[in-house]
Amino acid sequence: MQNYKQEFIKFALSRNVLRFGEFTLKSGRVSPYFFNAGLFNTGADLARLGEFYASAIQASGLNYDVIFGPAYKGIPIGTTVSVALFNKFNLDKPVCFNRKEAKDHGEGGNLIGSPLQGRILLVDDVITAGTAIREAMDIIAANNARLAAVVIALNRKERGKGELSAIQEVERDYRCDVLSIIDLDDLMQFIENEPEYSQYLPAMKAYREQYGVA
C-alpha cells in the first residue's frame, strides 16, 4: 500500500470521518465501517484532504485539462485539490463548479470558474448510487467536453442492487476510470496490521464476502 493511502486512513480515523463498528446504511445493510467526508470541515482538514487527492491524482498519471467539482460536496474538494496540486506539484490547473440552480443575472448560467472544456477530471467524496455523477455528465456533455476520469476519497467496492457496484456502472456507462484515494481492500489491509483495529477484520471480511465486487 502506498504511504499516502496509509496516512489518509490514519487522518480519516483521527477526524472520526472513518469509524469501525456497526452502522445501518440507507440501503438497510449493516456495515462494519462508516465514512463521512463532511467531517473534514476545518481549514487544516481541507488542506490535508486536498493533498491526499493530489497525491492520488499524480500517482495515477492522469491526463486532464480542467478540475470539475460538482455541487455541493465537490465544490470545496475541487478547490482544495487545485490548490494542493499547485503547492505540492507545481501544477496550475483550472477549476470549475456548478450551481444547482442557474442564475439569470450577473455572470449568469450554472457554471462558475474556468470554462468547462477539454478533458475533465471530476472530483467528489464518494459514489453511492451514481446519481450525482450522471447529473455532472449531463453538464460536461452540454459543454462539449469529455470526462477523463473521476477521483473520489473512498471506493467501498460494494454491489448495488445488481451485480455491479455504482462505480463499475459509471465506468461501464461512461468508459472512464474511477480512481480513489483508498478502497475497501486498503482498509482491510490497514486494520489487519493495526492491533487497535484488528478486532474488526472478521466483520470486514464477512461484509466483503457478502456484498463485495472484484
Curated annotation (Swiss-Prot):
EC id: 2.4.2.10
Entry's Gene Ontology cellular component terms: cytoplasm
Sites where the protein binds orotate: 34-35, 128, 156
GO biological process: 'de novo' pyrimidine nucleobase biosynthetic process; 'de novo' UMP biosynthetic process; pyrimidine ribonucleoside biosynthetic process
Pfam families, per database record: Pribosyltran
Catalytic activity entry: orotidine 5'-phosphate + diphosphate = orotate + 5-phospho-alpha-D-ribose 1-diphosphate
Keywords from the named record: Glycosyltransferase, Magnesium, Pyrimidine biosynthesis, Transferase
The protein's required cofactors: Mg(2+)
PROSITE patterns, per database record: PUR_PYR_PR_TRANSFER
Broad class of enzyme this protein falls into: transferase
Pathway: Pyrimidine metabolism; UMP biosynthesis via de novo pathway; UMP from orotate: step 1/2
Signal sequence, start to end: none
Binding site for 5-phospho-alpha-D-ribose 1-diphosphate: 26, 72-73, 99-100, 103, 105, 124-132
Single annotated GO MF: orotate phosphoribosyltransferase activity
Family matches, as NCBIfam families: pyrE (TIGR00336)
Similarity field: Belongs to the purine/pyrimidine phosphoribosyltransferase family. PyrE subfamily.
HAMAP family on file: PyrE
Function description: Catalyzes the transfer of a ribosyl phosphate group from 5-phosphoribose 1-diphosphate to orotate, leading to the formation of orotidine monophosphate (OMP).
Assembly information from the UniProt record: Homodimer.
Name under which the protein is recorded: Orotate phosphoribosyltransferase
